Amino acid sequence: MSAREERYQRGSKRPAARRENESDNGSWEQADLGNEERKQKFLRLMGAGKKEHTGRLVIGDHKSTSHFRSGVEDKKISDQLEHQYQQSMDSSMSGRNRRHCGLGFSESETTQEKAPPPPPEHPPERESESESSNEVSSEEESESESVSEEETAADKQKPTKPNEKDSFPDSRDGKSNYKMLFVKSTGS
């Protein structure tokens, strides 16, 4: 055996066979795409186009896009940005946006500290309201008070445990209705 055959037997890779037309398969520049413009676009999209360095690119170099700011304008813009930053920091620290509070956050602590005072039971009356509207509102208040007194009296009179006789037939009816529905649905 020759040395070459021994290497193949040991499991080493064979050298790649070169094709004569290999340059044709890998060359994008030789593709026939029509005119030169389409060819350049294709090469640019495929990333195979030749890079042409046109010189140093400076952002804002074009006269139509560049404008010069005065020192006063720069100061004004930086003040506005700083003010916006402070507002966002204050709002995030004050608790207005509590979406991302992290571990250990408890809503109950903050609500006890910053709970707004309860609204007054009777709002102050406006001078522009007529006396008839005041009379109507006072009648509604007295009616609502009497209704709430009747409800509390009715609650006290109701028995705490329902009668077993009343609840038992209802549960049996519910079971029989369920069975009948099941029988009807499977039978048809």
UniProtKB/Swiss-Prot annotation:
Span list, region Disordered: 1-188
Polar residues composition-biased segments: 83-95
Skewed-composition ranges (Basic and acidic residues): 49-82, 153-176
Pfam families attached to this UniProt entry: SMAP
Acidic residues biased stretches: 130-152
Residue ranges of coiled coil: none
Top-level taxon in the UniProt lineage: Eukaryota
Family: Belongs to the SMAP family.
PANTHER family xref list: SMALL ACIDIC PROTEIN, SMALL ACIDIC PROTEIN-RELATED
Record-given protein name: Small acidic protein
Species whose genome carries this gene: Xenopus laevis
Lineage start: Eukaryota, Metazoa, Chordata, Craniata, Vertebrata
UniProt gene name: smap
